[in-house]
Amino acid sequence: MASNKLRIYLKAYDHTLLDESAKRIAESAKKSGAIVAGPMPLPTKIRKYTVLRSVHVNKDSREQFEMRVHRRMIELVNSTDKAISSLTSVHLPAGVGIEIKQV
């Protein structure tokens, strides 16, 4: 029995850009007749880096940087060929990564 469920994972550093893209994808999937669940926020991955400010001495003086990767998931149930083709026509801004998996 073939499954018609698709999961769309979105990743971006900017959460506002990510939310707008997720909304666009969900709207285009709803217009094509698929049942949409989401966008669901997934845990944000935070990477922290600590570096010395000085090259040689002063270990007490450090600088900390962090990189946050925000993620969202959209689930499409009863996705048709029309829904999949409408997903390919959605224009996403630069900086938003997309991954589509069939469940």
Curated annotation (Swiss-Prot):
Gene3D superfamilies: Ribosomal protein S10 domain (3.30.70.600). One of its GO terms (biological process) is translation. Pfam families: Ribosomal_S10 (PF00338). InterPro entries: Ribosomal_uS10 (IPR001848), Ribosomal_uS10_CS (IPR018268), Ribosomal_uS10_dom (IPR027486), Ribosomal_uS10_dom_sf (IPR036838). One of its GO terms (cellular component) is small ribosomal subunit. Transmembrane segments: none annotated. GO terms for molecular function: structural constituent of ribosome; tRNA binding. Disulfide bonds: none annotated. Keywords: Ribonucleoprotein, Ribosomal protein. Belongs to the universal ribosomal protein uS10 family. Part of the 30S ribosomal subunit. NCBIfam families: PRK00596.1 (NF001861), rpsJ_bact (TIGR01049). Involved in the binding of tRNA to the ribosomes. This is Small ribosomal subunit protein uS10. It comes from Fusobacterium nucleatum subsp. nucleatum (strain ATCC 25586 / DSM 15643 / BCRC 10681 / CIP 101130 / JCM 8532 / KCTC 2640 / LMG 13131 / VPI 4355). The lineage of its organism: Bacteria, Fusobacteriati, Fusobacteriota, Fusobacteriia, Fusobacteriales. The gene is rpsJ.
